[in-house]
Amino acid sequence: MTATLERRESASIWGRFCNWVTSTENRLYIGWFGVLMIPTLLTATSVFIIAFIAAPPVDIDGIREPVSGSLLYGNNIISGAIIPTSAAIGLHFYPIWEAASVDEWLYNGGPYEIIVLHFLLGVACYMGREWELSYRLGMRPWIAVAYSAPVAAATAVFLIYPIGQGSFSDGMPLGISGTFNFMIVFQAEHNILMHPFHMLGVAGVFGGSLFSAMHGSLVTSSLIRETTENESANAGYKFGQEEETYNIVAAHGYFGRLIFQYASFNNSRSLHFFLAAWPVVGIWFTALGISTMAFNLNGFNFNQSVVDSQGRVINTWADIINRANLGMEVMHERNAHNFPLDLAAVEAPAVNG
């Protein structure tokens, strides 16, 4: 009898836990994805803060020349970063127990792996949690689909690119200047500015910003006034009301006269789908571009493609970019190798023709 009661009590505790996790009445929805998201993001955040403040220098290139990234070792907020795991580790899974000591683990950049892997798992669970909450509330799943764009971008930069290049040391450092360094080196090695998928991503981000600003300004400029001139227009509305708060016909008419008739939307659902899809698709393409360049399928190369009737090279903007890329590549990992890979080839490419 006692055993039966204990089993029932145990089952009820588990049942209460399940109900609490999946309840949409909580101030913050937990969800089953949240059960995994919370510890992974807390781990990533905690290790990041501690390492950013106090981590010792890391031998990023695997040549016994450690690079300092933390505040206590001479950096500031701008120059500080979590230095990627050493090239000596490569793509090996490198938890603390794989190192001979904590000092060795820190020297080889172990914190970078633990942060990145927990972070990627955490943001993927956050995306799943968005879908889960939408499902519980009877909503459509497009919020999670939109969030998949930054998740794909982060996965491309922190996981796919290191896999393609053969080492976590090629991942993006976790800091402000480290991010810019990653961008410069990426341009030098992969000519990303000449990759069409990156161009689509730029159009998506800047276009999305423009369209959001246009939409917000049009809506706030065409509110339906429910109050007198002596009261704020905001006082005429309440959260969740069924009536329209702005006049889309007026906004459509204004914008149609400002540009031309078919440049504006007269359907609210089409408009908001466009506002969501434009930047999301652009960032998807950028993530796909990073993932292809990870395996050295690089941007277009038009170097020395224009010649005169006598075969002499007429320099174009592509040749200027090529020269800049070589300069950036020479500066990168200057002690790890004497020449960038394309200069160290059997036949170096001519720059001046």
From Swiss-Prot:
Propeptide-annotated positions? 345-353
Indicate whether Methyltransferase appears among the record's keywords. Answer: no
Residues bound to a quinone are 215, 264-265
Annotated TM spans: 29-46, 118-133, 142-156, 197-218, 274-288
Q: Please state what the protein is called.
A: Photosystem II protein D1
Q: Give the binding site residues for chlorophyll a ChlzD1.
A: 118
Chain residues that bind [CaMn4O5] cluster: 170, 189, 332-333, 342, 344
Site feature Cleavage, where: 344-345
Q: What organism does this protein naturally occur in?
A: Conocephalum conicum
User: Where does the record place the modification N-acetylthreonine?
Assistant: 2
Ligand binding (chlorophyll a PD1): 198
Annotated GO biological process: photosynthetic electron transport in photosystem II; response to herbicide
Q: Locate the residues binding pheophytin a.
A: 126
